[in-house]
A protein has these predicted regions:
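Basic nucleic-acid-binding interfaces
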Residues: 1-142
Length: 142
């Protein structure tokens, strides 16, 4: 989480973004998530983004990223949703059968800024653990 520098600027901006699948359909399996990660890192290389963590559950994804200040959070969401939807539909045509209307992502999203002094490690661990079953900690009577 170092300060990134460029011509006439220095910044340290991190976003936690959640993208739900349209209709909260359960469509994200291992091959789809692997493809999604490949597409995500291609987006990172093309745009001034740094993907710090990507976690997927069966019906939504969490993204922890650092972005150039020229991108508003809404622009990042639009960019990510459009590219990933187009590429996932190309590489996994079976997704189109599950979703009518040609849309992969729901219209809504969640975005929050993440600071290194407060909730960074909590958010990073939460995203990393997406898709894994939580360990049940059930207290039992003797």
């Amino acid at each position: 989480m170092a300060v990134r520098k460029g011509h006439h600027r220095a910044y340290n901006i991190h976003y936690h973004i959640v993208f739900p699948i349209k209709y909260r359909k359960v469509l994200l399996n291992e091959p789809t998530v692997a493809t999604l990660k490949t597409i995500t890192y291609d987006i990172q290389d093309r745009y001034e983004l740094e993907i710090e963590q990507l976690g997927a559950d069966r019906d939504h994804i969490h993204l922890l990223c650092s972005a150039h200040p020229k991108y508003a959070p809404g622009q990042l969401v639009r960019l990510y949703k459009s590219i990933t939807a187009r590429e996932l539909f190309k590489r996994h045509p079976e997704l189109k059968k599950e979703l009518w209307g040609g849309e992969l992502w729901s219209d809504g999203y969640y975005v929050a800024t993440v600071g290194e002094k407060g909730n960074w490690s909590v958010v990073e661990r939460y995203i990393r653990d997406q898709g894994h079953k939580p360990q049940d900690v059930q207290l039992r009577l003797l």
